[in-house]
A protein has these predicted regions:
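Conserved coil-to-alpha-helix start sites within the AMP-binding
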Residues: 85-91
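Short beta-strand->loop structural element characteristic of the AMP-binding/adenylate-forming
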Residues: 100-110, 324
Length: 388
């Protein structure tokens, strides 16, 4: 049987003794609840990598997206522009917070929205643009920022959902990312971060993350009891200003992430080599749509499109190559989002034909060559044989 080629890093492909030793050190030090020195270090390092001043470590990228929007305190019914080809928890917070998603299509080969398609959706009710760096490819944030600035609409925020990758995007107002186990780096299998330049948005996001409370981590009684409720002096660690959540993560997750950040350049380099190998191997193969690669992309996985997707999926999976579809395709066709149903030609094509293949840092060039060999074999076969 062929070696299993996973869609995402599996087991010790993702971590090693460095992370294990760091976690053990953290456990021996005895502080688990988060907001400790490792959380602070991790927040600072990731925020700096993204070109932001402040980071807030949370339990998932999905939570980070919700906090990104919640921190802005937009008027009810505000419109938020977002692509139809996406991930569910890029869109869900828009609706959960009482806003209206306004969908646009994506480009067929990049899987992200063009600047023109985004800006064309702006109306007087638009208050935010929330775009994913889908599969690790990035929209043209510089052009989007320029075109937005040209509209003189200073009341529209740019939010990037960078769950799938790690990039520097100073053009955006808010960035989010995810440290789920399958991503470019992981914080012990989970975690996320929301990043800001403005302290006021960080403060509000922190309140939402920490149960809605006003207080921070100080133990100074003079600060804790410097608030009153109906003339009752009250500890602001238990004084609630908004309807919050518990989206906190732990020091164990943070220290794991700190070690992963040291490996990020290596992980990115391996992924880049694997993507370039795919592109070289498949460039002359008919019947397959390859992604447009800008060299700035830091791909989570390698996307392709073929007309008979299910047959190719079966062919690859039967040969121990794990596959995925390209996330939502057109998310307005999904049961939870049917009230927004629209035809988006490119997102619909991706929904029918899209496949994700592994390109992660646990894979070798030989693994990529094996996957490409199977794809070529499949495309040279009579389809009826594959479906038997």
């Amino acid at each position: 049987m062929e070696k299993k080629i996973w869609y995402a890093p599996n087991g010790f492909e993702a971590y090693g003794d460095e992370e294990i030793n760091a976690v053990n050190r953290c456990l021996r030090e005895g502080w688990l609840a988060g907001n400790g020195k490792y959380t602070t270090q991790f927040e600072n390092e990731v925020a700096s990598y993204f070109g932001k001043k402040h980071g807030l470590f949370v339990n998932s990228g999905s939570s980070a997206c919700l906090l990104a929007l919640a921190s802005l305190n937009l008027p009810s019914g505000s419109e938020v522009i977002t692509p139809a080809c996406t991930f569910s928890t890029t869109v869900a917070p828009i609706i959960q917070l009482g806003y209206k998603p306004v969908f646009c299509d994506v480009e067929l080969n990049t899987y992200v929205a063009s600047a023109e398609s985004v800006i064309s959706k702006i109306t007087p009710a638009t208050r935010a643009i929330m775009l994913p760096n889908l599969i690790g490819n990035t929209p043209d944030w510089k052009l989007i920022r320029k075109m937005l600035d040209d509209t003189s609409r200073t009341d529209i925020y740019l939010i990037e959902d960078s769950a799938d990758t790690m990039v520097c995007t100073p053009q955006t107002d808010i960035s989010t990312t995810s440290f789920y186990a399958s991503h470019v780096i992981t914080a012990c299998g989970s975690g996320g971060m929301v990043m800001f330049n403005e302290p006021k948005y960080l403060k509000r996001a922190t309140m939402f993350r920490d149960w809605g409370r006003i207080g921070d981590n100080t133990e100074l009684v003079v600060e804790r009891f410097n608030h009153s409720v109906d003339e009752i002096k009250y500890d602001y660690k238990f004084l609630y200003a908004c309807l919050g959540y518990n989206f906190k993560s732990s020091e164990v997750n943070a220290v794991f992430g700190v070690e992963q950040m040291k490996k990020l350049p290596k992980f990115v380099s391996i992924r880049r080599q694997n993507v370039e190998r795919y592109l070289e191997n498949l460039k002359d193969v008919k019947g397959i749509v390859l992604p447009s690669d800008t060299k700035n992309s830091n791909w989570l996985a390698f996307p392709i499109q073929v007309e008979d997707r299910l047959s190719l999926v079966n062919y690859l999976e039967d040969r121990n190559v794990q596959t995925r579809v390209i996330f939502s395709g057109n998310i307005t066709r999904h049961p939870a989002y049917r009230e927004y149903l629209q035809v988006f030609p490119n997102a619909d094509t991706i929904m029918r034909n899209g496949i994700l293949l592994g390109c992660h840092h646990g894979m070798t060039i030989a693994d990529v060559d094996t996957v490409c060999r199977f794809i070529k074999e499949f495309l040279n076969l009579d389809i009826s044989r594959v479906q038997e």
